[in-house]
């Protein structure tokens, strides 16, 4: 593997890095993709209506619709798996997972995905990238020969994400100040506040007002590897020159880095850029 000077086998500190899925590792909302696949109109309007009523925790709207909306009843396990295959992922998730697993300059990371989306959707989207036992999503029972969605077993939205992250932290024996959480929307507010209280690092993957105000850092990019920027700066103490070197060791160039209050990044394959020059 390239970059052995930065990614050694000997680790000094153990961290837990948890990421949301919808619009954090992907460009899509799982519920919207499911609606479009099944030809169901008005998904966003239904979600907005549930939000106005405060009927469910933020992020759990799809779960509610799957159980209580006539148009969504009868969705099968196979449908959820197919949705995952249609999700458009951000770039370099596999490389991000590899670098976190192998360690960064003496820091070792356990990488987990915690999402309010159905587990089958997230697992299908990330198959071969993130191990199934490192994905925590909403679980249902499935009924009958068609395996249609049945009862809700567990939802990881709102305070459910807090419980999931805390359970992971305790199981892995990670101190509160060595937790990193990455999220994009209102369903991440509670868990970000929880991580902040423990002096962990929170990273917003969108400029959603509430999240950007809570998160330690905000990074906007279509490449999942951009998460490493605040990790390397805040945890590793890297400056911009050293960060660029880390990316170059992996054959990547940070082509654009517009730093205001938000880090905007465009990451390109280094070999492709050099051949085009």
State each model region's role.
Residues 1-139, 222:
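Alpha-helical substrate-recognition element adjacent to the catalytic core
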Residues 84-277:
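C-terminal cap/substrate-recognition subdomain and adjoining C-terminal extension
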């Amino acid at each position: 593997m390239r970059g052995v000077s930065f990614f050694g086998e000997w680790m000094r500190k153990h961290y837990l890095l948890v990421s949301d899925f919808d619009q954090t590792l992907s460009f899509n909302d799982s519920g919207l993709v499911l609606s479009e696949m099944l030809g169901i109109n008005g998904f966003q309007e239904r979600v907005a209506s549930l939000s106005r009523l405060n009927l469910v925790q933020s992020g759990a709207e799809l779960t509610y619709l799957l159980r209580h909306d006539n148009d969504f009843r009868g969705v099968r396990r196979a449908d959820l798996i197919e949705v995952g295959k249609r999700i458009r992922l951000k770039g370099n998730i596999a490389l991000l997972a590899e670098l976190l697993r192998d360690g960064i300059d003496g820091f070792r990371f356990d990488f987990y995905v915690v999402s309010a989306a159905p587990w089958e959707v997230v697992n299908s989207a990330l198959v071969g990238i993130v191990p199934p036992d490192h994905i925590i999503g909403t679980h249902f029972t499935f009924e009958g020969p068609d395996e249609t969605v049945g009862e809700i077993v567990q939802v990881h939205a709102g305070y459910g994400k807090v419980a999931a992250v805390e359970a992971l932290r305790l199981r892995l024996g990670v101190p509160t100040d060595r937790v990193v959480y990455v999220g994009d929307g209102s369903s991440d507010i509670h868990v970000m506040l929880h991580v902040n209280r423990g002096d962990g690092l929170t990273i917003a993957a969108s400029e959603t007002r509430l999240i950007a105000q809570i998160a330690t850092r905000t990074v906007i990019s279509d490449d999942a590897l951009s998460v490493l920027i605040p990790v390397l700066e805040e945890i590793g103490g890297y400056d911009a020159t050293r960060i660029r070197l880390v990316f170059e060791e992996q054959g990547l160039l940070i082509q654009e880095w517009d730093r205001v209050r938000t880090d905007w990044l465009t990451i390109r394959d280094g070999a492709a850029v050099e051949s085009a020059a």
